[in-house]
Amino acid sequence: MLQDPEIEAVSIVLPDNMHREAVELAVAAKKHILLEKPLAKELEDGKAMYELVKDYDKVFTTGFLLRFDPRFAMIKERLDRGELGDIIHCYVRRNSPIIGPRRYIGASDLSMHVMIHDIDYVNWWMGCQPVKVFARNRSVLLKENGMNDVIYAIVTYENGAIACMEACWTLPENSPTIIDDKVELVATKGVAYVDSCDNGVRFVTGNGVQYPDSRHWYYVNGEVCGDLAEEVMAFVNNVANNTKSVITPKQSYDALRVVDAIERSIREGKEVEL
């Protein structure tokens, strides 16, 4: 497939530990690349991939779909315009039912599969480098699978701002919402909030209460809509117009660096530097 000159672009959705080889092959074949997050499973592979694609003359992007969520983009715009002032601290959470990790057993863990979304957009908002991480975990319901139930991480940035990140994927299977995520960002001139628990629509039936997804991937008239569709269309537009992605290789690598620091902090039981 990579040798076919009519194929200009590839989407890589392989398991995390296979990303490096797939990207290396795609780069050698001079293809535009949409890579599902994370950049890689191991930091060493992520660094090698970053070095490979940082000056790549084709489109390379990583699938952080929250970059295409208008709510998170609005916060970034107001930060860039100075309306909120300088970030003092923020709290973000991303919790979901246990059906998720039961599908992913052995393929990915909580920090890599879930928290990395929040890490990416918080890094993006901060506009500076993360420098220190302290993290704690607990495993109860997923202990026999060798996976974390919950992780809390405190990330300190170069500008002194602090981000507290919470991720849990062991909510009950019958939870009314697929993702319960929240943001509170406190800055010197204002505060920003995001609350995605109810998604703006609710159904009540004999089976209980449901808050279906109306943000990330859903259908309108049979067509996929939401952040995921916007992510794919942004990639297509980059390829068609010969422009760079808003998600840079460095940003993808930095998100992986924070994940690695979270796991190191958990293992060592102390704050670690990046």
Go through each PLM region and give its residues.
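Predominantly a Rossmann-like dinucleotide-binding segment in NAD(P)-dependent oxidoreductases
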Residues: 59, 66-145, 154, 162, ...
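Aromatic/hydrophobic pocket-lining residues that form π-stacking "cages" and hydrophobic walls in ligand
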Residues: 22, 49, 75, 261-262
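Hydrophobic residues in well-ordered beta-strands that form the structural core
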Residues: 35, 60-62, 91, 194
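Contiguous beta-strand/loop segments that form the cofactor/metal-binding neighborhood of enzyme cores
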Residues: 119-199, 229-241
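A short helix->loop->beta-strand "cap" motif at the edges of active sites that frequently abuts
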Residues: 29-31, 56-59, 161-162
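Beta-loop-alpha module in the N-terminal Rossmann-like domain of NAD(P)-dependent dehydrogenases
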Residues: 1-52
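C-terminal helix-rich "cap/oligomerization" subdomain common to oxidoreductases
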Residues: 9-14, 158, 234-274
